[in-house]
């Protein structure tokens, strides 16, 4: 009976040690952020507006494309909100930029 307990304990420890751990990068690169953008979207830096709301800075008027090397940390190039923008502002209801979660 004690051999069974030892085997169960060893299997439990081995399973816990083999569990994958997620390691987040402290400073995501341009390439990491750009990977969240879809087709025909450009990674952009959006200035914060005065409204303070959910759509603050994401309506496209204050966004500038980021053209930078893929290896550099994105915080070095954009200290405001990073977003994926289509550059298209045609239509009745249109939000040309979406937030990038870093």
UniProtKB/Swiss-Prot annotation:
Predominant cellular place of this UniProt entry's protein: secreted
SMART domains in the record: HYDRO
Keyword Membrane on entry: no
Molecular function in Gene Ontology: structural constituent of cell wall
Cystine pairings recorded for this chain: 37-84, 45-78, 46-63, 85-97
Record note on disruption phenotype: Leads to disordered conidial rodlet bundles and sharply reduced conidial hydrophobicity. Shows also reduced, adhesion to insect cuticle, insect pathogenicity via normal cuticle infection, UVB resistance and heat tolerance.
GO cellular component: extracellular region; fungal-type cell wall
One Pfam family it belongs to: Hydrophobin
Signal peptide span: 1-18
Key word Secreted present: yes
Keywords on record: Cell wall, Disulfide bond, Secreted, Signal, Virulence
Subcellular location: Secreted; Secreted, Cell wall
InterPro entries for the chain: Hydrophobin (IPR001338)
Task of the protein: Aerial growth, conidiation, and dispersal of filamentous fungi in the environment rely upon a capability of their secreting small amphipathic proteins called hydrophobins (HPBs) with low sequence identity. Class I can self-assemble into an outermost layer of rodlet bundles on aerial cell surfaces, conferring cellular hydrophobicity that supports fungal growth, development and dispersal; whereas Class II form highly ordered films at water-air interfaces through intermolecular interactions but contribute nothing to the rodlet structure.
Similarity comment text for this entry: Belongs to the fungal hydrophobin family.
Protein name stated in the entry: Class I hydrophobin 1
Gene coding for it: hyd1
């Amino acid at each position: 009976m004690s051999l069974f307990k030892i085997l169960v304990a060893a299997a439990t420890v081995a399973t816990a040690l083999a569990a994958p751990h997620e390691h987040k990068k402290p400073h995501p690169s341009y390439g990491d952020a750009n990977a969240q953008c879809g087709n025909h979207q450009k990674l952009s830096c959006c200035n914060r507006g005065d409204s303070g709301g959910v759509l603050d800075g994401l309506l496209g008027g204050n966004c500038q494309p980021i053209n930078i090397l893929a290896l550099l940390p994105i915080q070095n190039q954009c200290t405001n909100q990073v977003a994926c923008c289509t550059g298209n502002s045609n239509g009745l209801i249109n939000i040309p930029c979406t937030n990038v979660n870093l």
